[in-house]
Amino acid sequence: KKFRVLGTKEGRAIAGLSMGGGGSFVYAQRHPDMFNAAYSTSGLLDHRYRPKKVHSYENIGWYWSVAATSPVEYVRNATAEQIEKLRTVRWMLDCGDDDGIIFTNVDFFVEMHREKIPVEFRVRNGKHNWAFWRESLPLILKLQIRNLLFS
């Protein structure tokens, strides 16, 4: 089958969950000309979250990848030009109130507000698990449909 797609920023969004949520924000921050919206659900958005196992070799690689690309630090250190570009993307994040990394999401929200970059942040009942993420997907799809209709 063939599907019609829009090959422009207005027809493109990026989303992810957990580390993928952080990754979606990293990519959208570095390529704001490509996406009209970026979504993160339960995203690991800063390196200050350090699980107990981070000192083992099997886990240290992903931890340092977050430290090197922190979406929170990106906003904190962005130039005026980068801030203007970030304002062209619709940002949305959600996280469960019992998720151990919720504070990285709060930090991102605070930094975005400090720079007056519009962002939607939702905290719902839930943990860092598939039960929470299954509820997030319909919300993300509804928001993107709205974005496509009004772009």
Language-model segments: residues:
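Non-catalytic cap/lid and distal C-terminal segments of serine-dependent acyl enzymes
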Residues: 1-151
